[in-house]
Amino acid sequence: MMPFLLIDFPAFKPIAIEIGPFAIRWYALAYICGIVFGWLYARSLLKNERLWGGPAPISLVQVDDFILWVTLGIILGGRTGYVLFYNLPFFIEHPAAIFRLWEGGMSFHGGFLGCVVAVMWFAYRNGIPILSLGDITTAVAPVGLLLGRIANFINGELWGRATDASLPWAMVFPNDPTQLPRHPSQLYEAGMEGILLFTVLAIMIRLGALKRPGMILGAFILIYGLTRIAGEHFREPDVQLGFLWGGLTMGMLLSIPMLIVGLILIVLAIRRGAPRPIEAIR
């Protein structure tokens, strides 16, 4: 018998907003709100010349234009990453399913690579420093991650590993065929990838990190890698993959290179030093 401390999973409706035939699901709403907040927050950072040590290297008009391309990078990269990293055999047999985004299946690591492509392409086309555009993009990203993980929780998906039912906040997820008490790992990840990461980056920005191109980008990559690996210890692996080698999950495997890349970017940003204001506007 399960103890009385076990928390009942809230009975959320799958549709967040419904007006006649028009419906928006929670995950789509998380994407929309995350992108809108990110755009507004990016504009506020760019308006504050003190944070950059002079005029920001990106104009408000440019960041307005960039939103479209980074959104495409997130969606196309996220879906492509899920197809390649998590369920390739299924999609080889059912290629039409690749385009059924409403059925779910997105990968952060794929979305991140899609954003990298969008940043590099847009920066090159508009004469913007790539590292500075990467800094502003990753500075706003944690809010989208927070909302995405909350949407995962509301949808009752990507739940955590089974745990002792005596854990005070253990939950039984309605869609779990085993009906075992589990860690609400979506909320753990929301706290680490969203709240913690946003707070650390915000503090770094206030301390002048945007004056060192690549610093925020490197910190985001490094800290996300650390928090994702930590969260994977509580998250149930995708059923079609299970555990890989030595207890590694796909999420861990894809996050390990982020630790190296993030650390390299931070070291290079420190060695490079803060540019003079005249250099920052090139």
Curated annotation (Swiss-Prot):
Coiled-coil zones: none
EC number(s) reported in the record: 2.5.1.145
Pathway(s) served: Protein modification; lipoprotein biosynthesis (diacylglyceryl transfer)
Catalytic EC class: transferase
Listed GO biological process terms: lipoprotein biosynthetic process
Transmembrane regions: 19-39, 58-78, 104-124, 190-210, 214-234, 250-270
Record localization: Cell inner membrane
GO CC terms, sorted: plasma membrane
A Pfam family this chain is assigned to: LGT
Binding of a 1,2-diacyl-sn-glycero-3-phospho-(1'-sn-glycerol), residues: R149
Membrane topology field: Multi-pass membrane protein
UniProt keyword annotations, A-Z: Cell inner membrane, Cell membrane, Membrane, Transferase, Transmembrane, Transmembrane helix
GO MF term list: phosphatidylglycerol-prolipoprotein diacylglyceryl transferase activity
Domain of life: Bacteria
Family named by the database record: Belongs to the Lgt family.
UniProt function note: Catalyzes the transfer of the diacylglyceryl group from phosphatidylglycerol to the sulfhydryl group of the N-terminal cysteine of a prolipoprotein, the first step in the formation of mature lipoproteins.
Family annotation (PANTHER family): PHOSPHATIDYLGLYCEROL--PROLIPOPROTEIN DIACYLGLYCERYL TRANSFERASE (PTHR30589:SF0), PROLIPOPROTEIN DIACYLGLYCERYL TRANSFERASE (PTHR30589)
Protein name: Phosphatidylglycerol--prolipoprotein diacylglyceryl transferase
Gene name, Swiss-Prot/TrEMBL: lgt
